Design a protein with these regions (language model features):
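Detector for the mature cores of small, proteolytically processed
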Residues: 15-91
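DNA replication sliding-clamp ring fold and its partner-interaction surfaces
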Residues: 2-12
């Protein structure tokens, strides 16, 4: 989804509504998180989508401009953001 597509979808919603993202490790649960991070990144499309790993991979360079929406208190956020910024970590 492009930013302009997300903006169009959000423009159809109550501007006072809270933006939620799926809670992780909550299989079948109703727990969610309030999104509070928006980070510029680059990503590439994966050849095969997987319902556990997604359909894109963050890369440090050479990808398409992307925006990551997250929650700062997720226990994996810090490591994810660090890994996404280290060039030699790309596979």
């Amino acid at each position: 989804m492009k930013v302009k597509e997300l903006i169009a979808m959000l423009n159809e919603r109550d501007p006072e509504a809270i933006v939620l993202i799926s809670g992780y490790e909550t299989l079948g649960g109703t727990e969610v998180a309030e999104a509070d991070l928006l980070i510029d990144m680059q990503s590439i499309c994966l050849e095969q989508a997987d319902n556990l790993t997604g359909n894109r991979k963050v890369v440090s360079s050479g990808g398409e401009d992307s925006v990551w929406l997250g929650w700062k208190d997720d226990y994996r956020t810090k490591v994810f953001l660090e890994d996404a910024q280290i060039p030699d970590q790309d596979e």
